[in-house]
């Protein structure tokens, strides 16, 4: 992404990566493969950070994005997934942790 356009960008509710709506719609999320833009992304997010070296970054470990694709990530994403969707993710081996600041584990 050359330039972050906050009016056209969305953040993934699962991993927090920030991408243009069109990328999510055409390719899905690069980290978890979901492609239902309306269910799995939100246009409302706070703070952004660029993560270029996931395995070397203490911030990436702290934000729990150290196993994800390098890119721009939101520190908080407004919205949560419903329980049916969370269960479906769990069956696929994806551990969902809300990125809206409500999870304190």
UniProtKB/Swiss-Prot annotation:
<keyword id="KW-0507">mRNA processing</keyword>
<dbReference type="Pfam" id="PF06093">
    <property type="entry name" value="Spt4"/>
</dbReference>
<dbReference type="GO" id="GO:0006355">
    <property type="term" value="P:regulation of DNA-templated transcription"/>
</dbReference>
<dbReference type="InterPro" id="IPR029040">
    <property type="entry name" value="RPABC4/Spt4"/>
</dbReference>
<comment type="function">
    <text>The spt4-spt5 complex mediates both activation and inhibition of transcription elongation, and plays a role in pre-mRNA processing. This complex seems to be important for the stability of the RNA polymerase II elongation machinery on the chromatin template but not for the inherent ability of this machinery to translocate down the gene.</text>
</comment>
<dbReference type="InterPro" id="IPR009287">
    <property type="entry name" value="Spt4"/>
</dbReference>
<dbReference type="GO" id="GO:0006368">
    <property type="term" value="P:transcription elongation by RNA polymerase II"/>
</dbReference>
<keyword id="KW-0158">Chromosome</keyword>
<dbReference type="GO" id="GO:0005634">
    <property type="term" value="C:nucleus"/>
</dbReference>
<dbReference type="GO" id="GO:0006397">
    <property type="term" value="P:mRNA processing"/>
</dbReference>
<comment type="similarity">
    <text>Belongs to the SPT4 family.</text>
</comment>
<dbReference type="GO" id="GO:0008270">
    <property type="term" value="F:zinc ion binding"/>
</dbReference>
<dbReference type="InterPro" id="IPR038510">
    <property type="entry name" value="Spt4_sf"/>
</dbReference>
<dbReference type="GO" id="GO:0000775">
    <property type="term" value="C:chromosome, centromeric region"/>
</dbReference>
<dbReference type="GO" id="GO:0140673">
    <property type="term" value="P:transcription elongation-coupled chromatin remodeling"/>
</dbReference>
<dbReference type="GO" id="GO:0000785">
    <property type="term" value="C:chromatin"/>
</dbReference>
<dbReference type="GO" id="GO:0032044">
    <property type="term" value="C:DSIF complex"/>
</dbReference>
<keyword id="KW-0137">Centromere</keyword>
<dbReference type="GO" id="GO:0003711">
    <property type="term" value="F:transcription elongation factor activity"/>
</dbReference>
<keyword id="KW-0539">Nucleus</keyword>
<keyword id="KW-0804">Transcription</keyword>
<protein>
    <recommendedName>
        <fullName>Transcription elongation factor spt4</fullName>
    </recommendedName>
</protein>
<dbReference type="InterPro" id="IPR022800">
    <property type="entry name" value="Spt4/RpoE2_Znf"/>
</dbReference>
<dbReference type="GO" id="GO:0005829">
    <property type="term" value="C:cytosol"/>
</dbReference>
<dbReference type="GO" id="GO:0000993">
    <property type="term" value="F:RNA polymerase II complex binding"/>
</dbReference>
<comment type="subunit">
    <text>Component of the spt4-spt5 complex. Interacts with RNA polymerase II.</text>
</comment>
């Amino acid at each position: 992404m050359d330039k972050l356009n906050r009016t056209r960008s969305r953040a993934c509710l699962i991993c927090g990566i920030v991408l243009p709506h069109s990328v999510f719609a055409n390719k899905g999320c690069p980290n978890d493969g979901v492609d239902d833009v309306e269910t799995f992304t939100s246009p409302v997010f706070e703070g952004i950070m660029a993560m270029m070296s996931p395995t070397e970054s203490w911030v990436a470990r702290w934000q729990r994005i150290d196993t994800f694709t390098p890119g721009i990530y939101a520190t908080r994403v407004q919205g949560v997934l419903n329980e049916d969707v969370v269960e479906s993710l769990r069956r696929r081996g994806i551990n969902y942790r809300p990125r809206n600041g409500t999870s304190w584990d």
